[in-house]
């Protein structure tokens, strides 16, 4: 990936001869891979750095996302995508990274992901990548980013401060809806991407000699959360960043303790103390209190009062009279970034109940296995250590957790221009759609629990989920467990997501013919029906 980025000449630099092109784009590794704590299926997070050459929204669009579509490994002008299948006019004026990736034979599942930090998602050479984009003054690039491994927290803080000086303070006061509507996320996303790298570097500095203990504890807790279906920030659950903060806090406070003790203390703290706290300053979980750039941090850093206000406005607009359950739920787990950010922002009243229930169950199970763990510590039962850990990590099958399930089915033809993007967009809307359309309109439903792992991921549609005429389409399926009485859901969920997707295109034309090539459907199952489907689909 680094070589691919290095050999790419962005649109904003196309007026330079290739031989004299010196402002080479850079790939900056972030996330769990930089921490050395990646698991087998961890995404590789990267920040693409490009020398600034113009107005930031224009450069973002031209250099990063581009304006063309990726169809059959060709980057094509939207206006030149004809209705007749197979008649595609190739145009070569888009020099964006999106198009550079589109035409690479090792790239699969390429998509633009609009959000607080806009990213390009893809699979490259078998690995999943999430790429964000930052433009910096050429002087800063040359000064601090010649050697990635030599980058320090202080250097990155200086870069972020200079970047921040060019931004109006009001940008940091905007709520998420305003940020997306005014496209401020293209600029704010850049500073948050740099802040994410800063957090990773700071974790390494703080943990120092305890970094290996942290890595083991982090991977263990992450696997536990995944196996218990509460790992996935976009669905309102824990994510890699929140687990990193929680684990690093307990490694730093128990640096001389064993891995088992550290994890036990973390779960004990959450269940016996933190879950019972009122929402005030005492509940905020941090691993450092930064002292530098105090005046700037007063403007840009996360703030409890501001988030409470934003959550109240957000959920009041979304849910009307039943908003308090979610607006008053807050998990303030703060990354050591610049600006600081709350990793638990997406957690709501429903996912809060689910996470707490699973963590309490994990703590109870830990206590049952405590004697076996004590023997591990004394090296008396080493031969059984693998099985003891498996017993604790095992979260069972999702299809056993609830009596009723809802399948959210996004399907498209193989030739659909926008189908893959629509399904990607659908995934980002599931969390809030379940609150506003399913739970809010059905008081007998206590909560909905979406399994963060797709049931089907870009697979041929099976007859168990679609009508016969769609069996040659591609399916993405999410399964939602329902706690409470089930009432049939009408087409509102599908219609709302379609409407929001069309708004997101911001006036860019959607061919009528392509609108018929992707769909969103829902289907109910009881537990036994879902288990029978599993037996058919996964019998091999």
What are these regions (language model features)?
Residues 1-540:
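Non-catalytic helical "accessory" subdomain of NTase-fold nucleotidyltransferases
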């Amino acid at each position: 990936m680094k070589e691919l980025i290095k050999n790419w000449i962005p649109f904003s630099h196309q007026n330079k001869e290739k031989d004299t092109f010196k402002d080479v784009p850079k790939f900056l590794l972030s996330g769990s891979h930089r921490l050395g704590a990646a698991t087998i299926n961890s995404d590789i997070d990267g920040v693409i750095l490009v020398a600034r050459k113009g107005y930031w929204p224009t450069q973002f669009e031209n250099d990063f996302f581009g304006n063309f579509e990726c169809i059959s490994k060709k980057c094509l002008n939207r206006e030149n995508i004809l209705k007749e299948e197979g008649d595609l006019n190739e145009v070569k004026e888009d020099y964006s990274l999106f198009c550079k990736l589109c035409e690479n034979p090792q790239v699969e599942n390429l998509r633009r992901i609009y959000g607080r930090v806009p990213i390009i998602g893809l699979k490259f050479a078998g690995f999943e990548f999430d790429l964000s984009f930052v433009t910096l003054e050429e002087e800063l690039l040359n000064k601090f980013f010649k050697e990635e491994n030599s980058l320090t927290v202080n250097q990155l803080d200086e870069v972020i401060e200079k970047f921040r000086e060019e931004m109006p303070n009001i940008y940091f006061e905007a709520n998420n809806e305003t940020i997306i509507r005014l496209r401020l996320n293209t600029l704010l996303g850049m500073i948050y991407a740099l802040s994410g790298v800063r957090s990773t570097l700071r974790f390494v500095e703080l943990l120092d000699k305890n970094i290996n203990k942290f890595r083991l504890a982090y991977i263990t807790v992450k696997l536990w959360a995944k196996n218990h279906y509460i790992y996935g920030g976009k669905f309102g659950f824990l994510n890699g960043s929140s687990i990193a903060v929680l684990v690093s806090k307990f490694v730093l406070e128990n640096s001389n303790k064993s891995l088992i003790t550290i994890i036990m203390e973390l779960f004990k703290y959450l269940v016996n103390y933190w879950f019972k706290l009122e929402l005030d300053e005492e509940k905020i979980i941090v691993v450092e209190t930064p002292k530098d750039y105090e005046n700037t941090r007063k403007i840009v850093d996360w703030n409890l009062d501001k988030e409470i206000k934003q959550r109240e406005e957000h959920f009041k607009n979304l849910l009307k009279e039943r908003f308090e359950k979610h607006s008053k739920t807050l998990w303030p787990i703060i990354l050591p970034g610049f600006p600081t950010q709350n990793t638990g922002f997406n957690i709501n009243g429903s996912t809060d109940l689910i996470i707490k229930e699973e963590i309490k169950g994990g703590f109870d199970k830990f206590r049952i296995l405590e004697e076996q763990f004590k023997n591990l510590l004394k090296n008396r039962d080493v031969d059984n250590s693998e099985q003891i850990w498996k017993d604790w990590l095992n979260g069972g099958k999702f299809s056993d957790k609830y009596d009723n399930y809802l399948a959210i089915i996004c399907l498209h033809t193989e030739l659909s221009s926008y189908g893959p993007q629509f399904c990607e967009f659908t995934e980002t809307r599931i969390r809030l759609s379940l609150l506003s359309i399913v739970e809010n309109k059905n008081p007998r439903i206590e909560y909905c629990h979406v399994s963060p792992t797709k049931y089907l991921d870009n697979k041929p549609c099976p007859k168990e989920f679609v009508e016969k005429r769609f069996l040659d389409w591609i399916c993405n399926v999410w399964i939602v467990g329902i706690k409470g009485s089930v009432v049939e859901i009408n087409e509102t969920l599908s219609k709302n997501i379609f409407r929001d997707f069309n708004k997101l295109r911001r006036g860019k034309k959607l061919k009528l013919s392509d609108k018929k090539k992707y769909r969103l459907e829902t289907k109910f199952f009881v537990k036994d029906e879902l288990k029978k489907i599993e037996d058919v689909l996964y019998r091999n």
